[in-house]
């Protein structure tokens, strides 16, 4: 499987968009800042996501992006496929010419892996990732109380 940084970043950015989009369009600059993904890279990814109708853009002041459909209707596989080539673990990209123009001995194994991974990613909806993120335990670290610098005299 060739799940690249492009696919990982696209899923991360879409999750950020889903988490922050309730109040209106989300800017790529905001996603970039929160997720530490370069703005120019996000622009490339969101161009592909928009063409695949996973996001919609809103122009003008207060503009940005929002999901084109509900997060429960969007799988991780949809997102990954939108930004990169299909998931494929075979050496020959499914053409069955991996070994001297013939099928290699392990071709079926890699095809089965393709099916398993694709099925798994198809089953994970963006809404599941949103719920998981929102339900994570947050640890709050309190600063120690400042000590009085002036002693109290009696």
Map each language-model feature to its residues.
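C-terminal regulatory/oligomerization modules of transcriptional regulators
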Residues: 76, 94-154
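Key DNA-contact positions within bacterial/archaeal DNA-binding proteins
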Residues: 40
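Short, hydrophobic-biased segments on the C-terminal half of alpha helices
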Residues: 46-47
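N-terminal helix-turn-helix DNA-binding core of bacterial DNA-binding proteins
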Residues: 3-37
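Alpha-helical residues within the helix-turn-helix
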Residues: 33, 50-51
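Beta-hairpin "wing" of winged helix-turn-helix
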Residues: 53-67
